[in-house]
């Protein structure tokens, strides 16, 4: 099963996976009863966020409006009534807090399925634990640009607060948050890469080495990307985590 909201990407996936039996779904409720293996790779970073800014008189929502005929950030005039949570404690004026409203129902659905039927969910994304600050970003052609430039033409995302995912899966066992590079090394990626490199030459070998570095090196995806697993309680932790 694949959950994809973009019609354009669905067409691309269908072309790439035409030799396989795949069913596209609109939501997790369409997955039939039974144990699941659910992989969320760079899924949660794409979900919408709400941002809140701490000002002298309290918290205000960060909004987008028009200034000098261009998109610009601003804040709501009305102060918000904020419940005391970990997100909003130990903050000072000017701090920004990000909340993903859709995380709770999605993770609750995933954890309920795993708790009842068994299985595992592996979440791979860039982020951290107890995340605070402004992480809203835009990428176009592998370059970071102003998120308010070229609306509709760029990849918008924000870092994932893995602690929020864990809090909404309290009925399951949660693995330690592990760097992607550490996990891949524990699973033997370097040994496997060396074996594969023996049959490669020229540009193929160069690309192979670059791909290994990109996935594992601390200055690339190795540390930026984190991995967390959700399992039934009393389960044995999977290899590498």
Predicted regions mapped to residue ranges:
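Conserved adenosyl
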Residues: 1-53, 58
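Long, Lys/Arg- and hydrophobic-enriched amphipathic alpha-helices
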Residues: 83-241
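Short secondary-structure boundary segments
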Residues: 1-9, 13, 67-79, 239-241
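A mobile, often basic/glycine-rich helix-loop segment
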Residues: 37-88, 136-147
């Amino acid at each position: 099963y694949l959950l994809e909201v973009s019609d354009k990407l669905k067409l691309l996936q269908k072309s790439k996976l035409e030799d396989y039996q795949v069913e596209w779904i609109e939501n997790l409720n369409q997955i039939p009863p039974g144990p699941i293996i659910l992989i969320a790779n760079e899924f949660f970073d794409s979900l919408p966020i709400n941002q809140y800014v701490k000002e002298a008189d309290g918290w205000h929502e960060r909004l987008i409006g028009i200034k000098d005929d261009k998109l610009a950030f601003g804040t709501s005039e009305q102060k918000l009534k904020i419940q005391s949570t970990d997100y909003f404690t130990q903050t000072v004026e000017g701090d920004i807090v990000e909340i993903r409203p859709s995380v709770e129902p999605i993770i609750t659905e995933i954890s309920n399925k795993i708790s009842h039927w068994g299985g595992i969910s592996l979440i791979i994304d860039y982020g951290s634990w107890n995340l605070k600050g402004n992480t809203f970003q835009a990428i176009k052609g592998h370059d970071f640009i102003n998120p308010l430039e070229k609306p509709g033409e760029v990849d918008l995302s924000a870092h994932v607060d893995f602690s929020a995912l864990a809090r909404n899966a309290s009925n399951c066992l949660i693995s330690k948050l592990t760097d992607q590079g550490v996990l891949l090394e524990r699973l033997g990626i370097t040994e496997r890469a060396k074996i594969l490199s023996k049959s490669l030459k020229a540009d193929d070998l160069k690309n192979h080495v670059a791909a290994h570095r990109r996935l594992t090196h601390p200055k690339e995806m190795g540390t930026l990307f984190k991995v967390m697993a959700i399992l039934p309680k009393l389960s044995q932790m999977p290899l590498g985590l």
